[in-house]
A protein has these predicted regions:
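Small-residue-rich segments of transmembrane alpha-helices in multi-pass membrane proteins
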Residues: 20-30, 83, 144-157, 204, ...
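Membrane interfacial helix-start motif at the N-side
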Residues: 5-18, 88, 134, 200-213, ...
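Cytosolic, membrane-interface loops and tails of multi-pass inner-membrane proteins
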Residues: 1-7, 62-89, 183-206, 254-263
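Intramembrane alpha-helical segments
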Residues: 4-9, 28, 59, 79-169, ...
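Multi-pass membrane catalytic core of lipid/isoprenoid biosynthesis enzymes
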Residues: 49-54, 70-120, 176, 195-238, ...
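Extended hydrophobic alpha-helices typical of membrane-associated regions
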Residues: 222, 226-288
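Alpha-helical transmembrane segments of integral membrane proteins
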Residues: 5, 17-21, 41, 45-49, ...
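Membrane-embedded alpha-helical segments that form the functional core of polytopic membrane enzymes
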Residues: 23-27, 31-68, 78, 102-110, ...
Length: 288
């Protein structure tokens, strides 16, 4: 029982926000690509596969991140009690866990077409080099965005077995979304990060955080408008984006206090709701 508890803690499965932020772009890409005039069984099946894949790969990514960061985590108040940093789980055991999770994720992946499988495998280096970026650049959140939103492109390919401008624009927009919300998240640890020498966009833009996050979210919002235009969505889609705009611009940014770690966590977690809102936006565009 204790081992199960440690495994859940290690993989953050008790904190669904992580894998949901990985899953939402997958669902967006799947929804925008799918023909809802056809039977829905495939849509539900692929949605389930992408959810499972998100959970498995997020879990594996957390383990790799904790292995790489174990010496840093020991020095940060919020992370010092993580299983690897605290010595409750050995690095050897953690590596075995990550291989098992990747193996299970591959079993999920082989349900898709060959193009999707190939593109997914090509993204693996991105997924496992991200934890190193905070040592070398102030832009680790950018690399997280590139990695976390790759599923949007994969989902499109899984339906169409090809790619065009729509998922590419949406993908780049979603990268800015992640860049924004993970910058907010980073302000929880900014004091410790500055002491131990870890880099982040939170540190780089600490003097103008709202301006930078606003630019990120505006870029994401503009990508939604462009996608709607390219997809020939009706006016109902663009009207529904008002809710998305208010969530990003007013709820998340207007009253944001980056010096308040609890508020930063709340604003960060609210992006799970934002993911749902954008999904509904796309459904409106596709169906209504």
């Amino acid at each position: 029982m204790q081992n199960i508890k440690l495994f859940i803690e290690l993989t953050r499965l008790d904190r669904p926000i992580g894998y949901m932020l990985l899953f939402w772009p997958c669902l967006w890409g799947l929804t925008i690509a799918y023909n809802f005039d056809s039977e829905l069984g495939k849509f539900y099946f692929y949605s389930l596969l992408f959810l499972l894949g998100s959970m498995l790969m997020r879990s594996a990514g957390c383990i790799v991140n904790d292995i790489v960061d174990k010496n840093f985590d020991k020095k940060v108040e919020r992370t010092k009690n993580r299983p690897i940093a605290s010595g409750k789980v050995s690095v050897k055991s953690a590596i075995i866990y990550s291989f098992v999770l990747c193996g299970l994720a591959f079993l999920v992946l082989i349900n898709f077409n060959k193009f999707t499988i190939l593109m997914a495998l090509l993204s693996m280096p991105l997924a496992f080099t991200y934890p190193l970026m905070k040592r070398f650049t102030y832009w680790p959140q950018l690399f997280l965005g590139i990695t976390f939103n790759y599923g949007l492109v994969l989902a499109w390919i899984s339906v169409n077995n090809s790619i065009n401008l729509v998922p590419i624009i949406f993908y780049f927009g979603a990268i800015f979304w992640t860049l924004g919300y993970d910058t907010i998240y980073g302000y929880q640890d900014i004091k410790d990060d500055e002491i131990i020498g870890v880099k982040s966009t939170s540190i780089k833009f600490k003097n103008n955080p709202k301006k930078f996050i606003s630019l990120c979210y505006m870029s994401f919002f503009l990508s939604l408008i462009l996608v709607g235009i390219l997809m020939n969505f009706k006016m109902s889609f663009f009207i529904s984006l008002i809710i998305t705009f208010f969530h990003l611009g007013f709820y998340q940014i207007k009253n944001l206090e980056v010096s308040n770690p609890n508020m930063c966590l709340i604003k960060f977690k609210s992006n799970n709701l934002l993911g749902l809102i954008v999904f509904i936006n796309i459904l409106i565009g596709k169906i209504i």
